[in-house]
C-alpha cells in the first residue's frame, strides 16, 4: 500500500517548497532588508508561490538575488564580496552536491531559529556524505550575512577616502577572520559524518543511536569550543536548541525509518555458491498479521522457490514445470 507521503506527493511537495522559500525570504527581509522595495511580505509571498512550482534550486537562486540586491542597497563593496562568495559557493555546490538544495536553504533558516544542530543530524540520516558541501555552503552564508548585519553601520557609512577598501576588508573579515564559523563548520561536518556512519551500521535502533550521539557531540563540542574561544552567554541557547533539534530528529526517524524491532526475523538460506544470513526488520506501519516471511532451508524448498520465480518471470503456470 502506498504511503501517504507518496500518495499525496503532488500536493505535499509544493507546500513544502512554498513554506521553506517563504521562511527564507521573510528571514532575509527581517535581518538584511536594506532595499525596502523588495523587502515586503507581499513580495515574499509572491516569490514563494513562484518557488513552489520551480525546482528547489529556483528558491536558492531567487534568494541569492534578493541578498545581492540588499547588499547593493547597503554598499556596492559588500555586494561585490557577496557576489564572489556566491560564485564560489555555486561552484562548490554544483560540483559536489547538486541534489541537496534544501541543505543550502534550511541551514541558514535553522540558524535563524536557533536550532542549527538539527541540520547535520538530519542530513546524516537522510543524505549521503557529499551532502556536507551544501551544509558548508549554508553555514558560510549564515555567518557572512550575520556579520554584515552586525557591522551594517560601518559597511553602510558615507563614502570617504579609503572607505571602499575598508568596507571590503570588513566584509571579508566576516569570513576569513571568523573563528566561531570555523568552529561550527568543524563540529557540524564531523557530526554529519558520525551520524551517517552510525545509521549505516547493522545494529538495532541505529538511527536513534546516531541521533543521540550526534546531538551530544554537537552540544558538548559547541560549549567546549565557545569556552576555548572566550565566547560567553550561549550555553543555554545551545542546550535548548539541542533538545529541540533532538525532538525534530526523532520526528524525522518516525517519518522515514520507523521499524518494529520486536518482530525482527533472522533468516538463513543458501544457493549453489553461498550461505545467506539475513536480518529482516519489519516497518512499524505493517501489522503483524500482514507480515509474510519466506524462509529458505533445504534443497527442496530452494528448488520450489526457483521454480516459482521462473514461472512468475515467464508468466506461466508453475504446475507446468513439474
What are the functions of these language-model segments?
Residues 35-40, 70-84, 178-186:
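Structural signature of hydrophobic alpha-helical transmembrane segments
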Residues 49, 62-136:
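Membrane-interface helix-loop-helix junctions at boundaries between adjacent transmembrane segments
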Residues 110-111, 119-233, 238-242:
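Generic multipass alpha-helical transmembrane bundles of integral membrane proteins
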Amino acid at each position: 500500500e502506498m504511503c501517504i507521503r507518496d500518495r499525496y506527493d503532488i500536493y505535499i511537495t509544493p507546500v513544502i517548497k512554498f513554506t521553506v522559500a517563504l521562511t527564507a525570504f521573510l528571514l532575509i527581509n527581517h535581518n538584511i532588508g536594506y532595499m525596502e522595495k523588495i523587502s515586503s511580505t507581499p513580495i515574499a509571498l509572491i516569490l514563494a508561490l513562484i518557488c513552489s512550482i520551480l525546482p528547489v534550486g529556483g528558491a536558492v537562486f531567487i534568494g541569492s538575488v534578493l541578498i545581492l540586491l540588499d547588499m547593493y542597497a547597503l554598499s556596492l563593496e559588500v555586494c561585490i564580496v557577496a557576489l564572489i562568495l556566491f560564485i564560489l559557493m555555486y561552484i562548490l555546490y554544483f560540483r559536489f552536491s547538486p541534489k541537496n538544495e534544501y541543505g543550502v536553504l534550511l541551514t541558514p533558516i535553522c540558524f535563524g531559529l536557533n536550532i542549527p544542530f538539527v541540520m547535520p543530524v538530519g542530513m546524516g540520516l537522510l543524505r549521503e556524505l557529499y551532502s556536507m558541501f551544501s551544509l558548508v555552503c549554508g553555514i558560510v552564508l549564515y555567518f557572512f550575512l550575520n556579520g554584515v548585519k552586525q557591522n551594517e553601520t560601518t559597511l553602510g557609512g558615507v563614502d570617504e577616502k579609503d572607505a571602499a577598501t575598508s568596507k571590503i576588508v570588513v566584509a571579508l573579515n566576516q569570513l576569513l577572520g571568523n573563528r566561531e564559523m570555523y568552529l561550527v563548520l568543524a563540529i557540524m561536518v564531523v557530526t554529519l559524518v558520525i551520524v551517517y556512519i552510525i545509521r549505516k551500521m547493522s545494529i538495532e535502533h541505529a538511527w536513534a543511536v546516531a541521533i543521540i550521539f550526534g546531538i551530544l557531540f554537537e552540544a558538548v563540542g559547541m560549549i567546549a569550543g565557545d569556552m576555548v574561544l572566550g565566547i560567553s552567554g550561549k550555553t543555554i541557547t545551545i542546550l535548548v536548541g539541542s533538545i529541540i533539534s533532538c525532538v525534530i530528529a526523532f520526528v524525522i526517524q518516525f517519518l522515514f525509518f520507523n521499524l518494529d524491532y520486536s518482530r525482527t526475523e533472522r533468516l538463513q538460506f543458501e544457493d549453489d555458491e553461498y550461505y545467506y544470513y539475513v536480518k529482516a526488520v519489519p516497518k512499524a506501519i505493517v501489522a503483524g498479521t500482514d507480515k509474510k516471511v519466506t524462509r529458505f532451508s533445504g534443497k527442496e524448498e530452494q528448488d520450489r522457490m526457483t521454480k516459482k520465480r521462473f514461472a512468475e518471470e515467464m508468466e506461466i503456470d508453475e504446475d507446468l514445470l513439474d
